[in-house]
Design a protein with these regions (language model features):
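N-terminal secretory signal peptides that target proteins for export/translocation
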Residues: 1-9
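Low-complexity, intrinsically disordered/propeptide-like segments
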Residues: 5, 20-22, 28
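Bacterial N-terminal signal peptides
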Residues: 11-24
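OB-fold and OB-like single-stranded nucleic-acid-recognition modules
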Residues: 26-181
Length: 181
């Protein structure tokens, strides 16, 4: 009887470990979009995005002069130019309850207007945090990125910027959103 109890306990533990490992691997690779059947995007497709956010960064200068000047010792973290296609999402709702798409557009717009993080959900389910790139202008509220994200909420668009990956966290810093003065 004791052996059978131990075997059952070992089998249950193995199942839990496989489940946790599988979920962790899926999260790391971005293997799927949560609840894809719940609501589709408001505009655009992965083959034909409805718009474009940000200006293209270059390998020679992935960061703006403002960001370089604001960084520690004038050396920002490594970044590389990227153009990625995906749906603009409100990260807080997507990561908490899986909501995205046209049915969530109004809620997502309110969340982002009130300071929740903006994300890009790609076709393979990868998630990127989207942040305005110009450091001081972002800090001082002198960019239009958040407004653009609200306008394009639930749209599939192309986002241009600089990719930064730190400890598995992926962010695209979107350049060219400073307000005209």
């Amino acid at each position: 009887m004791l052996r059978r109890v131990n075997c059952v306990r070992i089998a249950k533990t193995a199942c839990v470990l496989l489940f946790v490992g599988g979920v962790s691997l899926a999260a790391a690779k971005g293997t799927r979009i949560l609840f894809p059947e719940w609501s589709g995007p408001t505009a655009g497709s992965y083959n034909k995005p409805s718009g474009e956010l940000g200006k293209k960064a270059t390998a020679r200068r992935p960061w703006s002069l403002e960001t370089v000047a604001s960084s520690i010792d004038g050396k920002p973290l490594n970044g590389k130019p990227i153009s990625a296609v995906g749906e603009i999402v409100d990260l807080s709702c997507y990561l908490q309850v899986g909501k995205h798409g046209d049915k969530h557009r109004g809620c997502g717009q309110k969340c982002v207007a009130n300071g929740q993080p903006v994300g890009l959900l790609t076709k393979d389910g990868s998630i990127y945090t989207l942040i305005d790139e110009e450091h001081n202008a972002r800090r001082d509220g002198l960019t239009t990125f958040r407004k653009q994200a609200i306008e394009h909420m639930a749209h599939i668009v192309t986002v241009n910027g600089t990719l930064s990956v730190v400890d598995g966290q992926k962010a695209i810093y979107v350049q060219g959103t400073m307000k005209k003065q």
